[in-house]
Swiss-Prot record:
Pfam families: AA_permease (PF00324). GO terms for biological process: amino acid transmembrane transport. This is Proline-specific permease ProY. Belongs to the amino acid-polyamine-organocation (APC) superfamily. Amino acid transporter (AAT) (TC 2.A.3.1) family. The chain crosses the membrane at residues 18-38, 39-59, 96-116, 117-137, 157-177, 198-218, 243-263, 278-298, 332-352, 356-376, 400-420, 425-445. InterPro entries: AA-permease/SLC12A_dom (IPR004841), Amino_acid_permease_CS (IPR004840). It comes from Salmonella typhimurium (strain LT2 / SGSC1412 / ATCC 700720). The gene is proY. Gene3D superfamilies: Amino acid/polyamine transporter I. GO terms for molecular function: amino acid transmembrane transporter activity. Residues 1-17, 60-95, 138-156, 219-242, 299-331, 377-399, 446-456 are cytoplasmic. The keyword Transport applies.
Length: 456
């Protein structure tokens, strides 16, 4: 099946732009936003703006290195080259584990969503179906993957735009509200804009940043981009404003139509908005959207882990068999391994006690922030490693240079502190540090084996 170990560049600027955009629009917006609103009130809008700025800093740092050295293993390779082999090893495996956990949640969610329409069909049938379908998609050419991901993301984005436009119609003209405009007074009528104080807004930041998780896939696409020097900068520069529009715009509409303390209490914010327009089948519309979102997420999950493991295998941080590719340039071994892992993980998800799964899911939050911190540290070390003339010649530099990166780093450390401060998420720090210790033990055994092979 395999012909060599090379990936093929088949992703266009259009594919990469929508992949980067779609990766940050998922359950964090469709469901997680309700919890963030409860925590911060209307000031959650400010939290999403602050989080968007931090996400942009992370993307620019990754983009600077990706344009200079496009690699499928992306931030794992950059960590290895700039911080050392151990940093690359831990970062790569932590990212893979993070995405696997997220993928477990996504495939399980797909079964639940389909159960809304077909309650008599067991969920495991839908879960098995979507895993096999996504596996087949990822075994095709990367161009097919990119095209499907483009349309998945397109449907998500189109639905959000329709909801924002419809919401503005309710706010300004009272469409669907008996001709009575709702206005925007709900943003300050129920306890003020900072209804839960500054602390409420600050505490919501950890949830906001998790909602932006997935943006780092833009770096992984660099290894298969046709023209990374053009496509990566265009994708990165276009995404932040769009994300801010979709998140901030959507929540602005929702909280203008409904008092913030009622959002999420009688159903999904998206369902409530459509129902307010007089659309009785709002639940089905939302269900189609979240189904598309979960398909997009699973598709990107398998793609991301496959490319990361392929790159790590080439670096010597993962088994060499993961470096094998098909004639189409697809890392088929990693795709099959991810598929098998998903099938086994879905089974575990059904038999696992709820609190245990919460612990594992919490690790994804820690792992996301960990990967972002390693990206920023790698960029700082990358800049220090280059002579001044090469720094000046960089084609996609971070605005403000290392100073901006350090500011982003301080912010992420603050997010980790928030995770530890909040009782519901504190356990993720314990589990996260335990994961790092396990990787360190694995690294020790790996180095010992490498020395033995070198002496043989």
């Amino acid at each position: 099946m395999e012909s060599n170990n090379k990936l093929k560049r088949g992703l266009s600027t259009r594919h990469i732009r929508f992949m980067a955009l779609g990766s940050a629009i998922g359950t964090g917006l469709f469901y997680g936003s309700a919890d963030a609103i409860k925590m911060a009130g209307p000031s959650v809008l400010l939290a999403y703006i602050i989080g968007g700025v931090a996400a942009y800093i992370i993307m620019r740092a990754l983009g600077e290195m990706s344009v200079h050295n496009p690699a499928a293993s992306s931030f794992s390779r950059y960590a290895q080259e700039n911080l050392g082999p151990l940093a690359g090893y831990i970062t790569g495996w932590t990212y893979c584990f993070e995405i696997l956990i997220v993928a477990i949640a996504d495939v399980t969610a797909f079964g639940i969503y389909m159960g809304v329409w077909f309650p008599a069909v067991p969920h495991w049938i839908w879960v098995l179906s979507v895993v096999l379908i996504i596996c087949a998609i990822n075994l095709m050419s990367v161009k097919v993957f990119g095209e499907l991901e483009f349309w998945f993301s397109f449907f998500k984005v189109a639905t959000i735009i329709i909801m924002i436009v419809a919401g503005i119609g309710i706010i300004v003209w009272g469409i669907g509200n008996g001709g009575q405009p709702t206005g925007i007074h709900n943003l300050w009528s129920n306890g003020g804009f900072f209804s839960n104080g500054w602390l409420g807004m600050i505490m919501s930041l950890q949830m906001v940043m998790f909602a932006y998780g997935g943006i780092e896939i833009i770096g992984i696409t660099a290894g298969e981009a046709k023209d990374p020097e053009k496509s990566i900068p265009r994708a990165i520069n276009s995404v932040p404003m769009r994300i801010l529009v979709f998140y901030v715009g959507t929540l602005f509409v929702i909280m203008s139509i409904y008092p913030w303390n009622q959002v999420g209490t009688n159903g999904s914010p998206f369902v409530l908005t459509f129902q307010h327009m007089g659309i009785t089948f709002a639940a089905s519309i939302l269900n189609f959207v979240v189904l598309t979102a979960s398909l997009s997420a699973i598709n990107s999950d398998v793609f991301g882990v496959g490319r990361m493991l392929h790159g790590m295998a080439e670096q010597g941080s993962a088994p060499k068999v993961f470096a094998k590719t098909s004639r189409r340039g697809i890392p088929w071994v990693t795709v099959l391994v991810m598929t098998i892992a998903l099938l086994f993980a879905v089974y575990l998800n059904y038999i696992m006690p709820e609190n245990v799964f919460l612990v594992i899911a919490s690790l994804a939050t820690f792992a996301t922030v960990w990967v972002w911190i390693m990206i920023l540290l790698s960029q700082i070390a990358f800049r220090r490693r280059l002579p001044p003339e090469e720094v000046k010649a960089l084609k996609f530099k971070v605005p403000g240079g290392v100073v901006t990166t350090i500011a982003g780093l301080i912010f992420l450390v603050f997010i980790i502190a928030l995770i530890g401060y909040h009782p519901d998420t504190r356990i993720s720090l314990y589990v996260g540090f335990a994961w790092i210790v396990l990787l360190l033990i694995g690294w020790i055994f790996k180095r010992r084996r490498d020395r033995q092979l070198a002496q043989a």
